[in-house]
Structure formats: C-alpha cells, structure tokens
Amino acid sequence: MGSFLRSLRRDVGPPTPSVGATPAKKEPPVPPVTPLEKMLQDMGAIREDGSDKFFGMENYGNTCYCNSILQCLYYSVPFREAVVNYPTRTPIESLEAALANTLRYQNFAANLEAEALAEKQKAANAQRPGAPPNQPQKPEDKDSPEYKKKMALQTLPLLETKNNATSYGMSESLFTSLKDLFESVVASQSRIGIIRPQHFLDVLRREHEMFRTAMHQDAHEFLNLLLNEVVANVEAEASKQPEPERSLPPAESADSTELSGSSGSKTPNTTRWVHELFEGTLTSETQCLTCEKVSQRDEVFLDLSVDLEQHSSVTSCLRKFSAEEMLCERNKFHCDNCGGLQEAEKRMKIKRLPRILALHLKRFKYTEDLQRLQKLFHRVVYPYHLRLFNTTDDAEDPDRLYELYAVVVHIGGGPYHGHYVAIIKTQDRGWLLFDDEMVEPVDKNYVRNFFGDRPGLACAYVLFYQETTLEAVMKEQEQENMDLNTSVADINDSTLKQNGYPLSPGLAHVHSASQIPSPSEPARFSNLQRAPTAPPLFPHPEHADSESSPADPSTTASATPPVPPIPDIHSLPLSPKKSDSHFKKERAKEEKERKANEKEKEKQRRRDQEARIREQRREDAEIRAALEASKASKAEEDRRHSPDDTKKSSHGLSRLKRGSKSFSHRLGKDKENRVSSSSHSATPIAEHPPSRNGASESQQQLPNGQSPGSHGLHTRHTGLDEERDTLKDPKHDRSGHHGKWRSFSLKKKSFSILS
C-alpha cells in the first residue's frame, strides 16, 4: 500500500497550462492607506468653501518656511475668504476647467515600476568593470518622514498652479499668485493631494532678491513680508480703478454668504481687509516725572514680537512687554511742556486688538560673545485660549477672547539651519501636522510639546490666535467631552477615537492604543512604539497633575487612556535633507561651543571680580591717605589760628620785610658816615656774635609743644626787634661805626633766615 502511494505521488505532478489558456494577470499594487485617508473616510460631500481640503506642499529645497506660513494663512478662515473673494470670486466652472489641466493623478504601479527599473540600472552600473563597489543600502524606515513624503509624491494627486491674474483684472503679483493657490485648492474635487507652489516661489524670488538663494530663511520675516506685499498689491490695483468701480461690492455666492455669517468673515469690498484682520494699534504712553504730563503716540502692527524669559508663559511675556521703562541719563525724554530733556516713564499698551493675533516669540537673539544670532531654548508656555490684559482704558473690546488655531514650529539648533512645520486646528477635524508633503492628524495634547526646554528640541516660533466667544469655547469643550466619553464607553472597539475620527493602532502622531485594558488588569498596558516623525518634547506637567487629582469621571474622562510617551528627538532629522549622524555632529558641536562659551564667561567673571577687588582696595587706600592728610592739615590750620601763632606772626617775616626796607633806607641816608667809618671793625663783631650761635643756644632750651624750627624762627624775630629798638635809640646815632656793623649783622641775620 505504501509503495502504491509513493508511485502515485511520483505520477502526480504540477498542472501544466493548456496551450490556448491565457496566463493570470498580476494584481496591481495598492498604495497603503494613510492616517489622513482613514480620518476622511466618514466625510460627506465636498464643500465649496475649501474647509475640508487638506493638501501638502512640495519642498523645493529649504522652502519649508514658505510652506508652513501658507498653510497657516489658508486655514485662517476670514483671510482665505477675503483672498478668494477679492476683487471677485472666480466662477467654479472656470476653476474646474482650469484644474482639468493642472490636477494630475499619480499612477502608483507605474511609479513603482520606474523605481524598480532605476534600482536595476544602478545595480548594473555598479557591476561594470572599473566601477566603485556598490555600498549596501539600509532598508527604508516606513515610519520616517522621508519615506512618507516620498510615498505621498508617488500616490497623491499633484496640483500645479498657473498665472490667472488676467481673469482677476489685475497684473501679476504676489497677491495674485497667492490667490491662484487658494482658489486651486478650493475648487479641487479631491480632499487630499500635494500642491506645487512653483509659480508662487518664482514670483517671490523675482520681486525679492533675498529669497533667490537656497539658504535657510526666517518664517516670521516671510510672514511680515507677505502681509505687507498683499496690502501694497491690493492698494496699488485699487488706485488704478475708477472710483465708481471701487465702491461697488463684489458678487457673492450663496455658499460664501452662509460661510460669512457663520464664521464672522465678510466679503471684502474695500482694500483694508488685511488691516481689519491682522492690524492692531499700539499706544506708547510717556509720563514726564517733572511736570507729570502724559503724552501718547500710536503705531500699528501686523504681528506682535515679544521677548522671552526662561520658565515663563506668553502672559508673562506680554506683561513684560507692557512693563514701565525708566527714561533717564542718556535716554531722557524731551518734554514739550518743560522744554527740555527730562526723566520719564514709558510703557506700551494695546489700543486696538486685531481679529487675528500673530505672536512672534523671539527665539533668535544676537550675542556679543559669539558675534552671531543664537537660538533661545527657553520654556514658554502658551495657552489654548488667551485674553489680553495690557490694553488702554479706551480700547475697543478689551475683553476679547482668543483661541489658538495654528503654531509654526522651528526644529534645529540655530537660526541658520533647521526645519519648519505647522500644526493647525481645522474646523471639524481636529489638529493636523503639516510637514511639507506630509499631512497627518495629531492629538490636541500634541500641541503642548513645543514649549521648548533645551538645545536640540523643537520650539514654537509663531503663534496664531483668532477671536472667539465664550459660548463657542464652552460648546467645543462639551463636544470634546462627549467624544471622549463615547470613546471610553466603546471598550470592544479595536481603535480609540480622538477628535471624532477612528485611528489606526500604528499612527505615529496620535499615539493610539490597540486595546484599552480594564482597570483591574494594569499589567496589560503595553509600551507604545515611538514615532520618528513627531518633533518630541516632554509631556506637560499639568497633564500629570490632572491625572493624579480626583475628578468626576463624566467630565474628566481623559484619565482613563494613558498619555503616550513623546517620541525621542534624536529620531527626528534636523531637516528633510540631512541624516541623523549629521544632526548629531551639529548638536555635539553646538554643545561644545556652548560649554566653551560658558567656561570663558566664568573666567571673564573671575577676572572682573579680581579687578573689582583690586580697584576697591586701591580706592580704600586713597581714601585713608586722604583722611590722614585732611587730619594733618586740620591740625596745622588750628595751630596757625591759635593766639600765640597770631602774636608770633605779627613779629615774623612781615616785620622782617618792613625792617629790611627801613634799614636800606637808613643806610642810603648815612652813606657818607658809613664810608668814613670803614676802618672800625673789631668792636661790633665782639659785641654782636652771629645769629647761628644764638639760634643753636636757644634750641637747647625749647618749651614743650614747639618744634626746633618754629622756636628758632621766633628767636630770630626777637633778635631783630631788639636790634631795631637799639637803632631807634638816639644815643646810638652819635657813633657811625656802630650803625655800620649793626647793619652788617642784620644782613647776616636776614640771610640766615631766608636761607
């Protein structure tokens, strides 16, 4: 029996195809379903206002700054409606006819075949003699942003824009190219795709030379330039039109009218719609401290730039922005009332609040030590809802409430390199991450990951707030609680619903769980996989506090699902064109520069401290010497003004001068007598010895408290007085030789005193 079965197996072979049978066709590859497509599965009909379109933008080499700002402006509902409706809204039929040539759908199978053919060609070239050895390639990471962007370019529809300025009745400008972008997305019959903003970039680089290079640009500078260019283009075209045409309002469709009533936006019939949306008014109040007169000066702004402090919030930064500033010393204020420079106090307040508030966090600061800009990784907390307090007393609607709807994030260690992404809140589909060609849904708490802490982390750079009402905020919170309660109650589902749409277990940015374990089985919690596409930060500490504090499960259902770990920042490349190793090298270099800078600052601080100590010691020595000299001069001054000194000074040098003059006069009169008695010389020398001996004798008996010099001077003065008394005696006039030798003796004394 066994031999029969073995022979039967040998006889039975694989079935041979018949001669006339056709081979079975190979099934074409199906592109993978993206998380965005899963989110849009339950969407209804396509809207005509463009609020349900989610297109990525192709990066043409460091153009992420442009893509992130354009995405934020497109999802600013009143701004998008104003751009589309000015000067008139293009009919939808014309747009659909134009999109028939500009919207191109991808052939995924053809792209795969072309990619496989390119790989074979590359391998064949490597096998040629003399060719360098082919390096083994690592398998592609399907969770990396580069792979997702490549798949998006191969599978999603590509939308190219053309110049339609003539249909608007305007000349080509940056505004018309922006209008081309917005209208193409609004009129598209596909909800997802990729825009190619090549025409917009061509106009931008043609009109502004600074954007012609492939260097890293600043997103905030581009936002400010774009808004000012839109204002200039609109006003320039309006000035060319006659007055009656400018006064006529443009035609409105029923859909646009309905949207305007619901969102609060109006179809622009003037050229000031950009000012009405983004423009605010700042008031500079300056109070003179001399006359206490307050002067005010108004200035407009399209975005508000605030300085940052470590471990602060947007509210504290705004408080510092409006803090009082003392104008003194070289920065005094010229008061017109006082007519000169005076000390004053200055502060900045907001007089008119904009409908859309663009807050620029000044992350890049110029440092004198490095002689270049440096990125500040300060932790600055920004809220979902904001109410400004630094308004003037006569401000319009000072209690206006704002809600956060877009965040532009800068990823990188410095201002000269890095990458920009945008996180935007849509009307009814929650928050989305726009990373050039890739668009993915994220959770609401994901927005809180960009407060900023240390080098290497992604930080929020520009915050977009739009006006809202308290009723809308309460309604939104109720809807979020209802959605969260529904997701918690649906335990048997395999996916967790957040923001009202189902998510797959492998979604990187939403961090959804495949199964919610019961509270009685805590050991069944599994570690979630980390996603390299999300710029990570640590979870906000307030969330942990909310989990630890007891609350009502009906209102605080967020405690049931655990907060997923934030992905590691090392897995996110610095830019789409840079590898992880290059990013690590740059970060190590920046860390080394930072440590060297800190060490140099510490050395400089020590040197400055030693110099201050030496200077302080020198000043103390000078002060002590000055005090000693002051004491000595005070004692000398006291001795001079004493009664004895006054008496001595009356018989001092002044008397000597008068005596010398009288002697000279006397000698001039008795010249003949002195000449006739020149032979008598011995007797006066014996009677009047030199004054030196007398001075030395008197120095041996000094009274207490007198110096030898002062006593000698007093003795000499006394001798002079005695000689003058002797000369004044009439009996001395009889012998001329006494007068001669006494005069000689007086000259000797005068010489000794002067010497």
UniProtKB/Swiss-Prot annotation:
Q: Which InterPro entries match?
A: Papain-like_cys_pep_sf, Peptidase_C19, Peptidase_C19_UCH, USP_CS, USP_dom
Q: Name one GO cellular component term.
A: cytosol
Amino acid composition bias (Basic residues), ranges on this chain: 654-666, 734-755
Which UniProt key words apply to this protein? Coiled coil, Hydrolase, Protease, Thiol protease, Ubl conjugation pathway
Q: Which Gene3D superfamilies match?
A: Cysteine proteinases (3.90.70.10)
Record field: compositional bias (Polar residues): 254-270, 693-709
Molecular function GO terms recorded: cysteine-type deubiquitinase activity
Q: Where is the USP domain?
A: 55-468
Task: State the coiled-coil residue ranges.
Answer: 581-630
Task: Please indicate which superkingdom the organism of origin belongs to.
Answer: Eukaryota
Provide the reaction this enzyme catalyses.
Thiol-dependent hydrolysis of ester, thioester, amide, peptide and isopeptide bonds formed by the C-terminal Gly of ubiquitin (a 76-residue protein attached to proteins as an intracellular targeting signal)
Q: Is this entry keyworded Phosphoprotein? A: no
Function, as annotated, reads: Ubiquitin thioesterase component of the regulatory network controlling carbon source utilization through ubiquitination and deubiquitination involving creA, creB, creC, creD and acrB. Deubiquitinates the creA catabolic repressor and the quinate permease qutD. Also plays a role in response to carbon starvation and the control of extracellular proteases activity.
The cross-references to PANTHER family, in alphabetical order and at most eight, read: RE52890P, UBIQUITIN CARBOXYL-TERMINAL HYDROLASE
Q: Which family does it belong to?
A: Belongs to the peptidase C19 family.
Q: What is this protein called?
A: Probable ubiquitin carboxyl-terminal hydrolase creB
